[in-house]
Every structure is written in structure tokens, then in C-alpha cells.
Amino acid sequence: MLDNVLRIATRQSPLALWQAHYVKDKLMASHPGLVVELVPMVTRGDVILDTPLAKVGGKGLFVKELEVALLENRADIAVHSMKDVPVEFPQGLGLVTICEREDPRDAFVSNNYDSLDALPAGSIVGTSSLRRQCQLAERRPDLIIRSLRGNVGTRLSKLDNGEYDAIILAVAGLKRLGLESRIRAALPPEISLPAVGQGAVGIECRLDDTRTRELLAALNHHETALRVTAERAMNTRLEGGCQVPIGSYAELIDGEIWLCALVGAPDGSQIIRGERRGAPQDAEQMGISLAEELLNNGAREILAEVYNGEAPA
């Protein structure tokens, strides 16, 4: 690798490429003279489109191939949507930078209805997420929830073709792709608690690559990193992947971290909720403590069913 070149491993979806270009532009602005190249790749999660993600199984469906490129020195960094990043990393790799968070909320998208509550009974709602599914089913058990896979453009096309009455997407993804006008309503966290890390972009690299880590330091956003640390600590203790019915959202309010989380049965019949408030330096411990509370209050049994009988210890 040339001293002035940095290679970014990225998925090829429009949203992934937006994220990679975002990081590229930030790096070049912070380090004039640096040449940044994109290394587009296809992941397992991009290829398996006819099966709900929860049934595909495995963690890191959208990141593994990028990590192999890092380990084989075909790329220097991998740029991820934080909600896709597993809680464990291959030996020698780690998450070193978290960029400033975009709006973390879920978006209600429909051509005919202004809000979730305006949908008539029996309406078909599309989502690929068990987390969204369980919260939708709890609030509106009279709706029909169907799996929805593919990139943002594909999902919107299926809505426009009449396959769904409404779909749920991430506000951040729509905004980044210039599709903010498609959002009928942003769902507040009390209606649809976001995924761990939703709206944040994370950067992974080889932990022994000091030069790259120094280049990335300027992109780290301290407040976002604190919030995501609390959310991910909770998820790690729950052994959650990106396809389990777990929601978590942390905010910094008046110098304190407020952390909310839930674990839900996919059919919405039971949702275990909890929250914590504490000092920023205790972010990780707060996440672990909240996870323990959820497990003790019934989340262990819910997750055992989702994980085919293998509950978190």
C-alpha cells in the first residue's frame, strides 16, 4: 500500500456507497493529499434476497466479506451501517471510529396513508426486521406484516407496485439517498424503538494499523460513540445479531446517558422493556446492567425461542 493511499471496502448498494463516499470525503477534507479508493464488494446478505434475514441465520451477513478483505490486506478500512455490525470481531480487527449519527428513527412510508394509526385493519405492512415487526404487531395486531427484502429502491418499488399498503424503513437511509419526501411520518422511539446503532456509520480496520487509525481519529464523533457504546454493550450481553427482536436507543440529556431497550416476541405478544440513566463514563456498564434486567424479566425465554433454544447465559 502506498503511504498516501487508503482503500475502503464497501458493499455495492446505493446506501452503502453513499456511506463510503461520505467517509472518503471526510478523510480527504481532513487529510489533503490523501488518495482514497473504494473497493466495492458483494456480501452474503446482498445475495440471499428470497429469504427473511432471521431465517438466513448467522451474524455479520453484511460485513463478513468486507472483513476478509481487511484481513487479506485488500482494503484498509471497512465502512458499515452500525446496525449491521456484529458484537464480535475477527481477531485483529476492531471498530475504531463511529461517525456522527443521522436521525435514528424508523420511517413510516405509504402512498395512501399519513400514519401508522391511519392504516385500516387488514392492511399489509412490509418490513425485514423482527424488531420492527414485534413493535408493529403489539401496537396494531390487526395489520398483516410481511417480509420485505432488498435495497431501499427495491423496497420502495414493491410499495409503489401495490404489494404493500405501507413499509417501514430507516429515516437515515432515506435522507442519505435524497428520498426524504417519501417519509410520511418519523416514528418516535416510544412507538418504534430503533435498532442498536441505527443511523450511525462505523469504520472497522486492522487494530495494528497505526497509520490508518491516526487518519480515522478526526472522523470519530464522541457523543455518538458514547451513545452507541451503551446500546452495543446491551446488545452484546444479549448476544444479539442484526436480526433479532431487540431495540435500543441512547440519548445524552443534561450530561447524562438515557438508555432505553426492549426485547420482543416476533408476534408482539410480549415485549420486555427497560431503561437506565447514568454518567457517560458508565455507558458500557449501563448497557450490561440493562441487558441483565431484561433477561431476568423474561427476555431470556423470548431469545431462547428466537435462537432455537440457545438462550444467552
From Swiss-Prot:
Its EC number is 2.5.1.61. SUPFAM superfamilies: Periplasmic binding protein-like II, Porphobilinogen deaminase (hydroxymethylbilane synthase), C-terminal domain. GO terms for biological process: protoporphyrinogen IX biosynthetic process. Pathway: Porphyrin-containing compound metabolism; protoporphyrin-IX biosynthesis; coproporphyrinogen-III from 5-aminolevulinate: step 2/4. Its cofactor is dipyrromethane. GO terms for cellular component: cytoplasm. InterPro entries: HemC, Porphobilin_deaminase_cofac_BS, Porphobilin_deaminase_N, Porphobilinogen_deaminase_C, Porphobilinogen_deaminase_C_sf. Pfam families: Porphobil_deam, Porphobil_deamC. Binds 1 dipyrromethane group covalently. Keywords: Porphyrin biosynthesis, Transferase. CDD domains: PBP2_EcHMBS_like. It catalyses: 4 porphobilinogen + H2O = hydroxymethylbilane + 4 NH4(+). GO terms for molecular function: hydroxymethylbilane synthase activity. The modification S-(dipyrrolylmethanemethyl)cysteine is found at C242. Tetrapolymerization of the monopyrrole PBG into the hydroxymethylbilane pre-uroporphyrinogen in several discrete steps. Belongs to the HMBS family. The porphobilinogen subunits are added to the dipyrromethane group. Monomer. PANTHER family: PORPHOBILINOGEN DEAMINASE. This is Porphobilinogen deaminase. The gene is hemC.
